């Protein structure tokens, strides 16, 4: 399939999910809980018949082998509740542009991932609130940003409310990826985040995230230290920002994101 066709197909899927938004009228009047801006996902789902959009702009800066690169993208997550404890998910980094010193500019569309999230249990009697996420990244992007085949991942998000308006989130996981020559390999995923509710509408967090834990032959471990804030404009709308600093040479030196999320 031509590389220009698949991004159009992804856009069609986004539009199709948006058409489901009117069904949100049958759901309860619950507030927004997002999966951004931190790496660790929320254990909660959006609720039956609810549609949630989480979109952003992301700028990354890196210097590797003497080449300075800046990459800009538009990470977006669409979530639709098909039940009280289950949601469908569509996620992509969207339009991606990289300026790499004397090597010129590379632009195109990132791959799209399809997934589900299952809210397993609420927090109670010392037990965390738990959610399970199963995603599959599809080789659907432009040639420059396209991965190799279907790459599945499984993550478990656990959250605890702590004294002093603090919260703790932990997310271990595993995934399967492919090298450029098609070789399959497995990798680990891990993140831990500590949040603080500053006011009823403001929260802040610090986080250590490892989206990929792998052998050096398979790209090595990618790890960041993150900090950010989120501001609830209303029960259904949130603004957020996050700064991420790379913890090793395999990770972009720095990244900054600004996001907007709303629930219908």
Regions found by a protein language model. Name each.
Residues 1-33:
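Cleavable N-terminal export/targeting peptides
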């Amino acid at each position: 399939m031509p590389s220009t066709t698949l991004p159009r197909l992804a856009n069609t899927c986004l539009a199709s999910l948006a058409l489901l938004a009117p069904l949100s009228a049958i759901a309860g009047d619950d507030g927004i809980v997002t999966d951004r801006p931190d790496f660790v996902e929320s254990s909660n789902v959006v609720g039956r018949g609810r549609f949630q959009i989480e979109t952003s702009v992301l700028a990354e800066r890196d210097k590797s082998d003497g080449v300075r690169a800046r990459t800009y993208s538009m990470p977006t997550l669409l979530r639709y509740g098909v039940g009280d404890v289950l949601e469908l998910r569509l996620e992509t980094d969207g339009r991606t542009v990289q300026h790499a010193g004397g090597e010129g500019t590379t632009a195109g569309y990132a791959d799209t991932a399809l997934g589900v999230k299952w809210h397993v249990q609420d927090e109670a009697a010392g037990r965390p609130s738990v959610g399970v996420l199963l995603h599959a990244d599809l080789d659907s992007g432009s040639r420059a940003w396209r991965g190799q085949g279907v790459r599945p991942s499984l993550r478990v998000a656990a959250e605890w409310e702590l004294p002093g308006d603090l919260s703790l989130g932990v997310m271990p996981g595993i995934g399967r990826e492919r090298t450029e020559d098609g070789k399959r390999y497995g990798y680990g995923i891990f993140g831990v985040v500590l949040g603080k509710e500053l006011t009823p509408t403001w929260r802040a967090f610090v986080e250590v995230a490892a989206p990929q834990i792998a052998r050096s032959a398979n790209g090595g471990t990618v790890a960041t230290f993150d900090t950010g804030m989120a501001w609830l404009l209303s029960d259904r709308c949130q603004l957020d920002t996050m700064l991420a600093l790379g913890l090793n040479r395999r990770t972009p030196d720095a990244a900054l994101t600004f996001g907007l999320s709303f629930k219908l």
